Structures are given as C-alpha cells and as structure tokens.
C-alpha cells in the first residue's frame, strides 16, 4: 500500500480504511523465537499457557504444523493471549495486546523434567505477564533462579510496556537489578531497555525522533553504550541490544564471568569473552512487515551460539535472519537456513548504510 509518514494520517475517527488480507499467525517468544530456533535446526521444547478457546486451538494447530514439541498448559479460566498488529507501510508496527493466560504463568509451571537435559532456557516477556512483574518481580526471580540452579543457561527478552497500564507503574530498574544475576544472555530492544532504566532519556529520544523511528536517531557511543554498561554492572553475562533498522549492539563480560554460564551450553569462553560489536543490518530483498524480526534474529543468535559459532558469525546470522524475516508478512515464512544465509553473506550481501 501507499507509504505513510505519521499514524494520524491513517487512524482518523469515523474514517473507513480499506486494508489487505489479514494474516493470522502465532507470535511472541514461544512461537516466534522458539519455532524459528526449530526451523534453524535447534532442538526445542515450547512451553506456554493458553486458554481453552478458538485462539488456543489455532496456536496448537500452528505448533503441530511445524512438528514442534510443545508442553502447552491449557487454562479453563483464562483466555489465550492475542495481539492485533497494525502493520502500515512506512511506519513501525502498532500492537493492541491482551495478555490473557500469560498473566497467570508461574515458576512452578515449568516441568522439572524439562530442566534435566536443557542447555538453554529462553524467556519472554516479563513486561506483559502480570504474575512476573507483581511484587517487584518476585515470581520472575524465583523462576530464573530455579532454572539457573537446575544447571541451565538462561536468556531473557522484553516487550514494550504500555505506560498507562499496571506494568507501566512497576519500578523496572529495580526488577532488572534483582533478576540480572540470573540472566546469562539478555536480549531486549534498546527502546524497551531505555524505558526501564531511564524514562527521562526515553522521553528525550522520542522528542528527538519526533515522528521518526527512535532507532534511526540513536548514537551508539552516547545513547546505546551507557545503557549496555548499566546492564553489565547489574550482572548480565552477555547483552544483545536490538537497535531496529540500524542493527544490533553486542557486548560480553570477562572470561571469569562467562565461565559461570552452564557447561551444557558448551560455550567457547575464550572466543566469547570481552567482546563489543555493532552489527549493521543487511539490506533486505524487500520489506513487507517488521513482525517477528527481533524475535527471529534472537533465535538465530541463540541457535548459532549453541551450534558453536563465534560471536562474529552468530551476529552475521542474526542480522541475516532479521533481514530475511521482514521480507514476509508473518514471522516465519521468510526465514532461510544458515547454509543459505552463509552463501548470501559470502557473496557480499550489502549492509545498510
């Protein structure tokens, strides 16, 4: 469709807007990151809570289609979480979200059996799961601590917070300070992290960006790095900050700190310690929708890490996956195998300027 510059050109009360076909797909950390890891060759088990309703049936159907091993908990009292994504050409997506059953997910919902052989536990998103952010994140800390003590490496992603909601009143800096010692690989977006650590700075970014995408006006040294440094001080072992179209920022702690990560991950500590990179995005073949680009690039990064790749290669594959994802309307159909991505990268795939 026709590109727009501002959302108020589109959403006007009383106006009828003709739109394209609806794409019904699963989303979020379990379906986007989890299924993408499976497509990219990872051995994954998917865990989440859904309602006994039509949306829950769709979720089960999608996971079945991908032959993914799922351990979905079905609630008779809660509805399946859903999101309406407004993906208009020319602007970032807008999300209308109902957390549903995700609000009632607890640490004890993770089967003990699943933790026995797992190398990595990836979790998202505490920001839109009421059980996880209440009481300064007590349940989140309990869960991450339990997983870590079971000998599993941990990674965590965030989602945007609706400032006017209950989650918007949470002291997120305090929650992050409490949970970070139990997070090995922290993979939020730079805007989400800034909102949590420094609301004033976040406000300033939005004002500076005016109607543009915030990530386009950020300076790595002045804007991104200070936030990354704070996370590392809080106890994160590795940090991958998604910075939108420009790319991703990665940094890691010392060899001594990385050696605390579970041996099941088989991480080459020498290769991964004390690194810092800004990985520019690759130019996509086309841009249809940003849906799932962050989640799937994280999936590629984590899969590459568990495959024994170097940080440089993991970042190339993550950036390549993000660029492949945006070439389709949904999160998964644009994904390419690591083999295809490596060929494309070796052939000189162009980076964004």
Label each PLM-derived region with a short phrase.
Residues 47-49, 73:
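Structural motif
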Residues 201, 306-307, 327:
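Amphipathic alpha-helix from the class-I
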Residues 1-47, 54-65, 90, 268-275, ...:
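Glycine-rich phosphate/adenosyl-contacting loop at the front of the ribokinase-like
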Residues 324-333:
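Short arginine-rich
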Residues 35, 42, 194-197, 249, ...:
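Short, small-residue alpha-helix embedded
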Residues 27, 242-245, 292-294:
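A short acidic Gly-Thr/Ser loop motif
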Residues 29-32, 55, 79-82, 295-298:
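Short glycine/serine/threonine-rich phosphate/pyrophosphate-binding segments
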Residues 2, 22, 61-78, 85-284, ...:
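Ribokinase/PfkB-type carbohydrate-kinase core domain
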């Amino acid at each position: 469709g026709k590109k727009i510059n501002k959302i108020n050109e589109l959403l006007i009360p009383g106006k009828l807007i003709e739109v394209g076909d609806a794409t019904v797909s699963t989303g979020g950390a379990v379906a986007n990151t989890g299924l993408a890891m499976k497509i990219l060759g990872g051995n994954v088990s998917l865990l989440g809570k859904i309602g006994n309703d039509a949306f829950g049936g769709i979720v089960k159907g999608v996971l079945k289609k991908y032959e993914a091993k799922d351990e979905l908990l079905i609630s008779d009292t809660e509805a399946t979480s859903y999101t309406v994504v407004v993906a208009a050409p020319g602007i970032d997506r807008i999300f209308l979200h109902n957390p549903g059953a995700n609000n009632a997910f607890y640490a004890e919902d993770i089967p003990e059996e699943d933790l026995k052989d797992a190398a990595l536990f990836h979790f998202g998103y505490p920001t839109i799961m009421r059980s996880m952010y209440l009481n300064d994140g007590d349940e989140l800390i309990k869960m991450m601590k339990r997983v870590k003590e079971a000998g599993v490496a941990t990674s965590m992603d965030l989602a945007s917070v609706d400032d006017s909601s209950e989650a918007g009143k949470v002291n997120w800096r305090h929650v992050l300070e409490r949970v970070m010692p139990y997070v090995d690989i922290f993979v939020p977006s730079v805007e989400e992290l800034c909102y949590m650590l420094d609301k004033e700075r976040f406000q300033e970014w939005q004002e500076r960006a005016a109607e543009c995408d915030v990530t386009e006006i950020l300076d790595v040294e002045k804007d991104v790095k200070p936030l990354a440094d704070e996370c590392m001080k809080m106890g994160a072992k590795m940090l991958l900050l998604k910075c939108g179209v420009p790319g991703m920022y990665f940094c890691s702690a010392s060899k001594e700190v990385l050696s605390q990560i579970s041996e099941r991950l088989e991480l080459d500590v020498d290769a991964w310690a004390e690194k810092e990179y800004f990985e520019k995005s690759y130019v996509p073949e086309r841009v249809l929708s940003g849906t799932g680009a962050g989640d799937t690039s994280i999936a590629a990064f984590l899969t590459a890490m568990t495959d024994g790749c170097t940080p440089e290669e993991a970042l190339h594959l993550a950036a390549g996956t993000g660029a492949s994802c945006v070439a389709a309307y949904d999160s998964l159909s644009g994904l390419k195998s690591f083999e295809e991505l490596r060929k494309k990268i070796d052939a000189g795939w162009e980076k964004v300027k």
